[in-house]
Amino acid sequence: ADEGVLVSGREFGGSDTFATSQILAAAIKNIGVEADDIVFCGRQAIDGDTAQVGSQIAEKLNIPQISYAADVKVDGTTVTVKRMLEDGHMTIETQTPCLLTCIKELNTPRYMSLGGIMDCYSKPVSVLDYNALKDDPLIDPTTIGLKGSPTNIFKSFTPPQKGQGKMLEGADKATCETLAAELLKKHII
């Protein structure tokens, strides 16, 4: 990358997917979406696992979007995407500008060279905060941050780990009776 942009501010804290997409769409508009641009998003976040932000950004920018992109080919302003499905894939074509939510198989990361690592320290990183974005109609104190989030998490926890399974070996009647007795004892059957 030649430059970076950090979107950050206290006003953005506590945002759910709706509010996050408002903020990111405003930031993308601030940077500028050109006719031949492609906005790349991940498939989903690991914290909420909702897979909503990318699609919501595309809606707010009024650009086409394709989800679950596994392979992308660009020819001028035509974008051809192999989209993964549960039981196969489909190939879709769209025009730029567009937004793609990508699965990890789309890219094989490469290791940075030492020179590349050193170069990254000289690349500019600008910050877009609330004051930089507040003139955008998407940035309204009632639609961003905790106040603007229609969903709230009241409790988050890691469920207790279940114990190791019990292994039964054998293919005789006694093994089957032992299995049936265990299942009855646990009220499974």
List where the protein language model places each region.
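N-terminal glycine-rich FAD/FM-binding segment characteristic of electron-transfer flavoproteins
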Residues: A1-I189
